[in-house]
């Protein structure tokens, strides 16, 4: 006898990437034990990996309902909600976790990020401030604060927090982008553009597109007629930006 339980085998399937098999195994268990919270948790994780988020949410909620005190289940539910784009609901779950353990900065930072995703920047700033108060040297907390303050239009506060985040998270693209955003908000257009251009050369995919769009908007507002003509042609602007051929004045 190996001594391994069916749940151990399901975990192995999930870790090995065989999520369809994990779902089938959990279905078999729940057919005979529908109130097994641990099985609902594993089924939710497998479904989430498969992108079946609606089903994953239902199983995560079942796990929470069956054992409301299990932190792991609430974390899972918050993650599923976030992936579904239900950022307000995810923020509420993270806020509940943080309330039960106020010294845990991870959940408070997660709440702040979800508040931004839910277009609730003021509440995100409040959560981020709590995290910074708990641990001023936490780069993720400073980053969340910088992003929230930028969304609320607080240029000075965003610049201070973003500078801290960039120092605490050296080279981190998100921290560098937050600092560029704060500089733009504080009318340091030249510094913001230079950082956006640098990020555009280093990033790819959607991240590159996002920072390029910011650089393009900034450039269009500062350049002369020739620069505006360049900015009007997206592929040309992106190509010139990545080669360092574009700049703006002070």
PLM regions with names:
Residues 2-38, 42-49, 79, 83, ...:
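Alpha-helical segment of the N-proximal tetratricopeptide repeat
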Residues 16-24, 50-62, 84-96, 118-130, ...:
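Structural signature of tandem alpha-helical TPR/SEL1-like repeats
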Residues 167-173, 181-209, 216-217:
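TPR/TPR-like (Sel1-like) alpha-helical repeat modules
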Residues 34, 68, 102, 136, ...:
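Short coil turns that delineate tetratricopeptide repeat
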Residues 3, 37-38, 71-72, 104-106, ...:
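Helix-start (N-cap) detector for alpha-helical repeat units in TPR-like alpha-solenoids
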Residues 30, 64, 98-99, 132, ...:
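A conserved position within tetratricopeptide repeats
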Residues 198-201, 207-250:
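Terminal, low-structured helical/coil segments at or just beyond the last alpha-helical repeat
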